[in-house]
Amino acid sequence: MEESGYESVLCVKPDVHVYRIPPRATNRGYRAAEWQLDQPSWSGRLRITAKGQMAYIKLEDRTSGELFAQAPVDQFPGTAVESVTDSSRYFVIRIEDGNGRRAFIGIGFGDRGDAFDFNVALQDHFKWVKQQCEFAKQAQNPDQGPKLDLGFKEGQTIKLNIANMKKKEGAAGNPRVRPASTGGLSLLPPPPGGKTSTLIPPPGEQLAVGGSLVQPAVAPSSGGAPVPWPQPNPATADIWGDFTKSTGSTSSQTQPGTGWVQF
């Protein structure tokens, strides 16, 4: 995988101490108790950066940011960064200069939380590097990836509960019948004890009572009891008399030969 052209910052710790460590005589791990912990060789700021697959541990001055030492890390855990066996706050890192010279120094943090963040930052970076390498391999050889086998193995069976399936289908096929709507607006009954008001026609209008047109009696304006309605005339009376008279007078005024029938 090609290295990217920009550098990202993974972790910054403002307080770190550097120690000179004695050479390791055996294959056993480093011990911080063998260092002069009360007399650090240098104190400053630690910064972890990443560029592509590589990570860099940089020891810088707190005020000016001048680089004191740098440790390139190509894998973690590895020889570039090692933990001591007797404490979780101290590590041994391998620093390099521009001329290819290398040296091992000890670093320590005053707070265990800072040491934990230092460790996790390196772990997360190289976990990401591993994932990127796997993705690149899968992109080059997509057929070599694991295939999903959904077939039945020899002798493998499955059980289907058809009874429950039929019940569900029956329940879904019989929707609830909604009551038919009567349509229109429902009229409320009149209030109890109410009286139906009698409509009195305006003066000058005629009402058909018992088959004849009568003129309603008008009560005098002075007030008093209402005048009773007159008795209906016999049914033999011609109820269309006034109507035929009015239509006859109208038809007499109509010019003959127009082709229209008057009603």
Curated annotation (Swiss-Prot):
Residues 166-194, 219-263 are annotated as: Disordered. Keywords: Cell membrane, Cytoplasmic vesicle, Endocytosis, Membrane, Phosphoprotein, Protein transport, Repeat, Transport. Its main location: membrane. The keyword NADP does not apply. A motif (WXXF motif 1) lies at residues 240-243. Belongs to the NECAP family. The WXXF motifs mediate binding of accessory proteins to the ear-domain of AP-1, GGAs and AP-2 through hydrophobic interactions. Selective binding to the GAE domains of AP-1 or to the alpha-ear domain of AP-2 is tuned by the acidic context surrounding the motif and the properties of the second residue of the motif itself. Interacts with AP1G1 and AP2A1 components of the adapter protein complexes AP-1 and AP-2. Interacts with the GAE domain proteins GGA1, GGA2 and GGA3. This is Adaptin ear-binding coat-associated protein 2. It comes from Homo sapiens.
